[in-house]
Regions:
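A generic local secondary-structure boundary/capping motif
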Residues: 83-85, 134-135, 143-145, 188-189, ...
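Non-catalytic nucleic-acid substrate-recognition regions in nucleic-acid-modifying enzymes
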Residues: 2-140
Length: 239
């Protein structure tokens, strides 16, 4: 298993700087991009950022990047990645999402199917399994995503599961409550300090107030998110 990964913390448009600041406060060097912030870290970093980032949506591992102008290039690119360092024998690995933007490859279901085939072939080769015998996917789930932008494919593994905004205390919600990570970003951008009054003009479900209260007592999202994905990934749960 690899000791260091390239990771991305995804964020809503316009909130990348807030997520980058949170990462730097945790001690990581960052590279801010559209909709995400890149950083390097090991297994501990995956757990730590899933636990403590408040404005991010998800934490994903970048498995690899390569040109993909044809389905053959896509297959060979996915096949060439070192999947044995990410997926244990028996793991479930659905290609949960494919996105193609401004690229020659645009049929997203086909991208998913080709990518799945490539991962299966690679694991069959590594674990010495016959090609005609399907892999048993009965273990922990590792959701794989393939994004192709301007003919460049990026392959990722989602480590979060349920989006981090679902860390809330609510058992019910109204028509359009603000997401907890958006509330956290608003509070960060407002430069509010604990010695000042905090007023939530929308009130409603008191998301902004409760988000700040959770922050003040350093409530970990793991305690509020019982379906936290990393708890189910046996290969990483020792962290």
């Amino acid at each position: 298993m690899k000791e260091t990964f390239t990771l991305v913390a995804t964020a809503a448009a316009g909130l990348e700087a807030v997520v980058g600041r949170e990462l730097r406060e945790l001690g990581y060097d960052t590279q801010v991009e559209n909709g995400k912030v890149r950083f390097q870290g090991g297994v501990r970093a995956i757990a730590e950022t899933n636990l403590w980032l408040r404005a991010a949506d998800r934490i994903k591992i970048v498995v690899g990047e390569f040109p993909a102008r044809t389905f053959e290039e896509l297959f060979q690119g996915v096949f060439a990645l070192d999947w044995e360092n990410y997926l244990p024998l028996g793991a479930k690995f659905p290609i949960s999402k494919a996105k193609c933007v401004k690229s020659k490859l645009h049929n997203e279901p086909s991208v998913q199917a080709i990518s799945k085939k490539a991962v299966v072939k690679k694991l069959q080769k590594y674990f010495h399994r016959p090609e005609g015998v399907p892999l048993q996917e009965t273990g922990a789930e590792f959701k794989i995503e393939v994004s192709i932008l301007k003919d460049k494919a990026t392959v990722l593994i989602d480590t979060t599961g349920a989006s981090l905004f679902k860390r809330g205390y609510r058992t019910d919600k109204g028509g359009a409550p603000i997401k907890e990570n958006m509330a956290a970003a608003i509070l960060e951008l407002s430069n509010w300090y604990p010695d000042k009054p905090l007023i939530d003009p929308t009130c409603g479900f008191r998301v902004i107030i409760m988000t700040q209260a959770n922050s003040q007592v350093n409530t970990r999202v793991l305690e509020l998110l019982p379906k936290f994905k990393i708890k189910k990934m046996n290969r990483w749960c020792a962290v």
